[in-house]
From Swiss-Prot:
Comp. bias intervals (Low complexity): 219-228
Protein name, UniProt field: Protein ABIL4
UniProt keyword annotation of Phosphoprotein present: no
Annotated family: Belongs to the ABI family.
Naturally occurring in which organism (per UniProt): Arabidopsis thaliana
Domain of life (superkingdom): Eukaryota
Length: 279
């Protein structure tokens, strides 16, 4: 409702303005026509007085009437010129105000368009800046945990990553597997061949995991021929077995305690280097 009423007011004002403009133009054209007719009237009056002055006997009365008519004609011409100039000035003043308002509207529209263009340009540059991905770290990052002088680059990613994964796999093994490894490290299976000497090298069995498990040299060794019959392992004497078990358990505990300290650090380094190389 408010929009319809405002539109009706604007239309009414525009119609009134058009009506006033038409009235002013008609009045101005009428005054110009009166001036043109005044010229014709003056010429016809001059011809009439010329003919009457030559024919009439009372020339003094003709001269006086001519003077009166000329004075009235001059007054009428001045009046017409004044009215025309007044109307022309009013027309110019009204149009000048209208022109000034239109100029202000145009300037405001230009300013709005300029602001919109600036905003669009800034938003576009902001979006382009968001698209860029700037590096957050250097190519070589120094870790103060293992010493200030050491650094970790992207060249040795694979080696350290594999070692870290192996250490995590060993750490996450169940206790039963660890106990089996510990107990199995002290039993040996003899290598028996029918036609081949004992000098042939043994081959380690392949691990089912992706990364092979770290094994000590004292684990069980299997023969390369799967068809050979298995024999019971040779039993060591009791004192020798107790000494070897105690020594091996101490060595394994020392290795595990030393390896656990650097497992998490190596894993963290490997992951950081891989993320840097991808960036």
């Amino acid at each position: 409702m408010a929009s319809s009423t405002s539109l009706a007011i604007v239309l009414h004002q525009s119609s009134n303005h058009d009506e006033l403009f038409m009235k002013q133009t008609l009045q101005f054209s009428e005054t110009l026509k009166d001036l043109k007719n005044l010229r014709k009237q003056l010429y016809s009056a001059a011809e009439y007085f010329e003919t009457s002055y030559g024919k009439a006997e009372h020339k003094e009365t003709v001269i006086e009437t001519l003077k009166e008519y000329a004075a009235k004609a001059v007054v009428n011409t001045v009046d017409h010129l004044g009215s025309v100039s007044d109307k022309f000035n009013s027309f110019l003043s009204d149009n000048s105000t209208h022109f000034s308002t239109t100029h202000l509207r145009l300037s405001s529209l230009e300013q709005r368009m300029r602001l919109c263009r600036d905003y669009m340009g800034k938003s576009g540059t902001h979006q382009h800046l968001l698209l860029f991905q700037y590096p957050r770290h250097h190519k070589r990052y120094f870790f103060p945990q293992q010493g200030r002088g050491t650094s970790f680059s992207a060249g040795d990613d694979s080696h350290r990553f594999t070692s870290a994964v192996r250490s995590t796999i060993l750490e996450n093994l169940p206790n039963t597997a660890r106990k089996a490894n510990k107990t199995g490290s002290f039993s040996f299976a003899p290598i028996v061949h029918n036609n081949i000497n004992n000098r042939t090298p043994n081959k380690r069995s392949n691990s089912p995991m992706r990364f092979p498990l770290l094994r000590s040299g004292s684990l069980l060794k299997r023969s390369s021929s799967p068809s050979q019959p298995k024999k019971p392992p040779l039993a060591l004497p009791e004192p020798q077995r107790a000494i070897s078990v105690s020594r091996n358990t101490e060595i394994v505990e020392i290795k595990q305690s030393s390896s656990r300290k650097g497992k998490k650090i190596l894993m963290f380094k490997a992951l950081m280097s891989m993320s840097k190389s991808r960036n």
